[in-house]
């Protein structure tokens, strides 16, 4: 099990293959991604790499984290993430991770944060049909309707689908195929869409439910 990398979503584009089929691609950029630290089985109970990306002002880093970056002999990073690995896949601290960590034709899992929608009603958030447009219904056309039962239990159960905050959730999309890798521009072209807004950060790692192939 190898480490993943932290990348930045650039946007979407499309290309045509040899059959004339249009393929939607998401472009992610891998820039200044470095190994910050190690987590070992003997000391922490599991094997993992701590990966960081994007330089950060030293004045905005806490004193404990300053020492972590000083020990690694690298500049402070804005984004940090742990990736579980097998024992034989450790990489030296301060080593850089580039786009050639992945190859075209390989399948990957993408973890990202969805776009926040704010407070949303039940029709938008849960795809409810709403109430009738007429026949005695007034004011409450887009309401969710009844949420409880009677005096017993006399409450609304946790997890009930209702209006509330929508989006801004961590989501993992599995088995997305890498269309191409552009080492010169530091870009990975991934087939399909990826959660998150433009310039948001996401993690890319080998797919765990599909055997990757190189085309």
Swiss-Prot record:
Region (Disordered): 136-155
GO biological process, one term: translation
Record bears the keyword Cell membrane: no
UniProt keyword annotations, A-Z: Methylation, Ribonucleoprotein, Ribosomal protein, RNA-binding, rRNA-binding
Any single GO CC term annotated in Swiss-Prot or TrEMBL for this entry: ribonucleoprotein complex
UniProt keyword Protease present: no
Domain of life: Bacteria
Modifications after synthesis and translation: Methylated by PrmB.
A molecular-function term among this protein's GO annotations: structural constituent of ribosome
Residues the record lists as N5-methylglutamine modifications: 151
InterPro entries reported in the protein's UniProt record: Ribosomal_uL3 (IPR000597), Ribosomal_uL3_bac/org-type (IPR019927), Ribosomal_uL3_CS (IPR019926), Transl_B-barrel_sf (IPR009000)
Description of how the protein assembles with itself and partners: Part of the 50S ribosomal subunit. Forms a cluster with proteins L14 and L19.
Task of the protein: One of the primary rRNA binding proteins, it binds directly near the 3'-end of the 23S rRNA, where it nucleates assembly of the 50S subunit.
Alphabetized NCBIfam families for the sequence: L3_bact
Similarity comment text for this entry: Belongs to the universal ribosomal protein uL3 family.
Protein name: Large ribosomal subunit protein uL3
Organism placement in taxonomy: Bacteria, Pseudomonadati, Pseudomonadota, Alphaproteobacteria, Rickettsiales
């Amino acid at each position: 099990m190898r480490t993943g990398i932290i990348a930045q979503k650039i946007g979407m584009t499309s290309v045509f293959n040899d059959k004339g089929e249009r393929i939607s691609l998401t472009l992610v950029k891998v820039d200044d991604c470095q190994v910050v630290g190690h987590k070992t089985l003997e000391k922490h109970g599991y094997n993992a790499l701590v990966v960081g990306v994007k330089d950060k002002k030293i004045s905005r880093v806490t004193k404990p984290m300053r020492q972590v970056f000083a020990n690694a002999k690298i500049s402070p990073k804005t984004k940090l993430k742990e990736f579980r690995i097998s024992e034989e896949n450790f990489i030296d601290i301060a080593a850089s991770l580039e786009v050639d960590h992945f190859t075209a034709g390989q399948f990957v899992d993408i973890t990202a944060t969805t776009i926040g929608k704010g407070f949303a009603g039940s029709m938008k958030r849960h795809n409810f049909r709403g109430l009738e447009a007429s026949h005695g219904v007034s004011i409450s056309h887009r309401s969710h309707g009844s949420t409880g039962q009677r005096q017993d239990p006399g409450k609304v159960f946790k997890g009930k689908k209702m209006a509330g905050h929508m989006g801004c959730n961590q989501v993992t999309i599995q088995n997305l195929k890498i269309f191409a890798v552009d080492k010169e521009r530091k870009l990975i072209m991934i087939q399909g869409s990826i959660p998150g807004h433009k310039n948001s950060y996401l993690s890319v790692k080998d797919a765990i439910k599909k055997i990757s192939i190189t085309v």
